[in-house]
Swiss-Prot record:
GO terms for molecular function: toxin activity. Expressed by the venom gland. Keywords: Disulfide bond, Knottin, Neurotoxin, Secreted, Toxin. Belongs to the neurotoxin 37 family. This is U18-ctenitoxin-Pn1a. GO terms for cellular component: extracellular region. The presence of a 'disulfide through disulfide knot' structurally defines this protein as a knottin. It is found in: Secreted. Disulfide bonds join 2-16, 9-22, 13-46, 15-34, 24-32. InterPro entries: Toxin_34 (IPR013605). Neurotoxin. Causes spastic paralysis and death in mice by intracerebroventricular injection at dose levels of 3 ug per mouse. The keyword Transmembrane helix does not apply. The keyword Isomerase does not apply.
Amino acid sequence: SCFEGGKDCKNDCQCCGKWSYCKCPIWGLFGCSCVIGDSMVEVRKCQ
């Protein structure tokens, strides 16, 4: 679930951008985050 644009995601990847993929460490126990490309920079902003 996403907050308004530019804000953080809420423990899921519904607001991952077009060039990012979803990463859920420890089986999603602490939620998921969006990762852009190969930089492994976690992006958790709404698009």
